[in-house]
Amino acid sequence: MKKWVLAIVYGLLAVSAYAQPKGVVLDTLKVQHIDFQGQPQQGIIICNKAISKDLREIFLELYKAKYPIERIRPISEYGNDDERSMRANNTSCYCYRVVEGSTKLSKHAQGLAIDINPLYNPCVRRKKDGTLLIQPATGKPYVDRSKSFKYKITERDLCYRLFMQHGFRWGGAWRSLKDYQHFEK
């Protein structure tokens, strides 16, 4: 049986198919960012209160450096559909879901992980049949990290460095899969 939760987030009606995990306290952050047209925008991040100070500081530094992030909206604006949010290149944090292919809650379900410019920094894993699973599927042109293209997160990137300074782990450094968009604590 599904639980339906209604929440008002800065005037937006957010409907989630599941409640947040027990003991998780979520916070709503308004952050400034520079979009791909070079214009300042205000984004909304739903995150675990335990990382809200870190995220506030990181996004302030990214904003000061004019680091481009296309959009930052709650996943509820995409019907809580992670693939749809990633295809729109939406940077988001909290999303109540399990780790792909398991029953374990993801760090996103705890509000402890954030995905940055996910279209250009896809999650890539090899399936048992040897084929690649690319998320978002439209991120296929950005799988080859030896190519040069805009908005790519690497170990030399400011976004990477700021998250590392704040004690986050980067999915792009994982061995089992590569999740270039993903930072978690």
Feature locations, PLM:
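Positively charged n-region of N-terminal signal peptides that target proteins for export
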Residues: 1-4
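Hydrophobic h-region of N-terminal signal peptides that target proteins for export
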Residues: 10-18
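Cell-wall polysaccharide-cleaving catalytic domain and substrate-binding groove, primarily
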Residues: 18-38, 91, 96-102
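Extracellular/periplasmic catalytic domains that process cell-envelope and extracellular macromolecules
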Residues: 22-25, 105-111, 164
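Active-site acidic/histidine clusters and adjacent loop/turn architecture
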Residues: 25-86
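Stable alpha-helical elements in mature extracytoplasmic
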Residues: 51-58, 112, 155-159
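Mid-length scaffold segments of soluble, non-membrane domains
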Residues: 84-119
